[in-house]
Each structure stands twice: as structure tokens, then as C-alpha cells.
Curated annotation (Swiss-Prot):
GO terms for cellular component: cytosolic large ribosomal subunit. It comes from Bradyrhizobium diazoefficiens (strain JCM 10833 / BCRC 13528 / IAM 13628 / NBRC 14792 / USDA 110). GO terms for molecular function: structural constituent of ribosome. This protein is located at the 30S-50S ribosomal subunit interface and may play a role in the structure and function of the aminoacyl-tRNA binding site. This is Large ribosomal subunit protein bL19.
Length: 126
């Protein structure tokens, strides 16, 4: 293992020690709780939307979340290992066949919806 990979692994372990980052991907609806600093106070703000892509890897990995706010599309890019992220929660899993869902930017209304992925284990267990 070379020196750069070793340093990155140490930083990755240190940053992810207190966090529980769930497995999620494009098409999943997530709630990202972000720490917002206002003056001398900090508060947690929830940002809910569809993950339209992940990029990078290791410490540099980030993901883009898109939501519709008052009829206007808003996208925000979050670094996965950011100390400003309090928690990430997956609300529902989406069934998509693309790694990047940039085509959602051009869709409106019902056509912009993503079909929910059916869990095969739950269907077998019933």
C-alpha cells in the first residue's frame, strides 16, 4: 500500500468513526440532515430529495440530491465525508437503470417520478 492510500485510509477511518452512512445510490430518496451555522448557533436542517448521482471515491466521494421547492428544481452537492452532514437516511429505494439521472432535469410532474424498487427478500418471506 503506497503512502497516499495509507494516509487516505487513515483519514477515512477517522472521519467515518462516528457516522453511520447507509448504502444508497441514484434513484433513492434520501433525507440529509445538514448542520447550518447561523452566527454563534448551529442547527440541523433536513434536505429531502432524490439522489441523481454519486461521483468520486474514498474521501472525495460526493452525491447530488435534487428536490422541487415551490415549483423550482433545486440541486445540492454533498461530500459524503463532510463534517457538516449530521446524518443520512434512505426514505425509499428507486428502480433506475442509469448511474446519473440528469434527464430528470427536463421532466415535470408525474413523468419525473421514479418507480419504487420492490425488495425480493420481503416478497419471498410473505
Amino acid at each position: 500500500m503506497n503512502l497516499i492510500k495509507q494516509l487516505e485510509q487513515e483519514q477515512f477511518d477517522k472521519l467515518s468513526a462516528g457516522k453511520d452512512i447507509p448504502e444508497f445510490g441514484p434513484g433513492d430518496t434520501v433525507i440529509v440532515n445538514v448542520k447550518v451555522v447561523e452566527g454563534d448557533r448551529t442547527r440541523v436542517q433536513a434536505y429531502e430529495g432524490v439522489c441523481i448521482g454519486r461521483s468520486g471515491g474514498g474521501l472525495n466521494e460526493s452525491f447530488t440530491v435534487r428536490k422541487i421547492s415551490y415549483g423550482e428544481g433545486v440541486e445540492r452537492v454533498f461530500p459524503v465525508m463532510s463534517p457538516m452532514i449530521d446524518s443520512i437516511k434512505v426514505v425509499r429505494r428507486g428502480k433506475v437503470r442509469r448511474a446519473k439521472l440528469y434527464y430528470l432535469r427536463n421532466l415535470r410532474g408525474k413523468s419525473a417520478r421514479i418507480v419504487e424498487k420492490q425488495d425480493r427478500q420481503a416478497a419471498v418471506g410473505e
